[in-house]
Amino acid sequence: MKILRKNHPLLKIVNHSFIDLPTPSNISSWWNFGSLLGMCLVIQILTGLFLAMHYTSDTTTAFSSVAHICRDVNYGWLIRYLHANGASMFFICLFIHVGRGIYYGSYVLLETWNIGIILLLTTMATAFVGYVLPWGQMSFWGATVITNLLSAIPYIGNTLVEWIWGGFSVDKATLTRFFAFHFILPFIIAAFALVHLLFLHETGSNNPSGLNSDSDKIPFHPYYTTKDLLGIFLLLLVLMILALFFPNVLGDPDNFTPANPLNTPAHIKPEWYFLFAYAILRSIPNKLGGVLALVLSILILATFPLLNTSKQHGLIFRPVTQVIYWIFIANLLVLTWIGGQPVEYPFTTIGQIASITYFAIIIILIPVSNTIENNIIKL
């Protein structure tokens, strides 16, 4: 078997990626989230496949088909809640994965980082179109509000919105195409994830110290396979607790009401994992400005390698930037909270301050703290 895994055309790819891969000996549990994201993707594709067997993408039957899955299909309720809460687990792992990349300076691996940003955007798009499928009140109005933002694009905006809708409003054509997108996008994510891994294995993994670890590598198997398995069991435990005991805690009560174009919910809001971006969107009174801020809130991640002037790798030995980093995380939590609040004082003001702080930390404070720390090293 040893010879086979090293010489077989297919098995040697697996061998170089997951068995004999030279890995830094000191990577911590923060490095577990890559494998957890892979696990989440597998869970989502499998549960999604079984849901798609019973779901109908028609405005008259979509809501009923989801109810039918929960009531009449064997373990349909479990599959549906694993899928819905699996999306939340996916985004928790995703945000921690990105946060770890920022903290430990993984953005210096340019290709891996940029593919990661594409993966983040694709996952957000997949989650958005998936949220529309149950055809509840919040699904319908969320789709209407978010797709309508594209009308802010000069000249082509209105045409683009009607093209995406497949008509003059969110209707049957929209639901059908959103189902098609939601089915194909996870496989595109899987393909991008392989490219992400390919680029990562070209350079090798980063490590907590931020130092070159070429002289201290260990094989991925059995050390990190067992470590990843522990993470996977913990993830599955949390997911099962969510799906079995608190299945609707992260959902919206409005989605228990079938979509009604004549009745608008009091507060239109997306799923919790989009609330930070939604708060940034709402904090700018101008429509086009809000849309640009929304897009930039994710694309600004691409500026980390450009704005990095530090002579040290990662934040482990940089206390000034560490403080700014944790302020940034706290600010993100504030934005998430504000995104779920009604548009009224004082929430609008807090949202505007938090949005300005979000961009200021990345564009101004982190580069300034880098310069300060570089000068301290010279002393």
From Swiss-Prot:
It is found in: Mitochondrion inner membrane. Disulfide bonds: none annotated. Heme b b566 binds at residues 97, 196. Its main location: mitochondrion. One of its GO terms (molecular function) is ubiquinol-cytochrome-c reductase activity. Its cofactor is heme b. The chain crosses the membrane at residues 33-53, 77-98, 113-133, 178-198, 226-246, 288-308, 320-340, 347-367. Binds 2 heme b groups non-covalently. InterPro entries: Cyt_b/b6_C, Cyt_b/b6_C_sf, Cyt_b/b6_N, Cytb/b6-like_sf, Cytochrome_b, Cytochrome_b_C_euk/bac, Cytochrome_b_N_euk/bac, Di-haem_cyt_TM. GO terms for biological process: mitochondrial electron transport, ubiquinol to cytochrome c. Keywords: Electron transport, Heme, Iron, Membrane, Metal-binding, Mitochondrion, Mitochondrion inner membrane, Respiratory chain, Transmembrane, Transmembrane helix, Transport, Ubiquinone. It is a multi-pass membrane protein. The keyword Magnesium does not apply. GO terms for cellular component: mitochondrial inner membrane; respiratory chain complex III. PANTHER family: CYTOCHROME B. Component of the ubiquinol-cytochrome c reductase complex (complex III or cytochrome b-c1 complex) that is part of the mitochondrial respiratory chain. The b-c1 complex mediates electron transfer from ubiquinol to cytochrome c. Contributes to the generation of a proton gradient across the mitochondrial membrane that is then used for ATP synthesis. Belongs to the cytochrome b family. Heme 1 (or BL or b562) is low-potential and absorbs at about 562 nm, and heme 2 (or BH or b566) is high-potential and absorbs at about 566 nm. This is Cytochrome b. It comes from Akodon paranaensis.
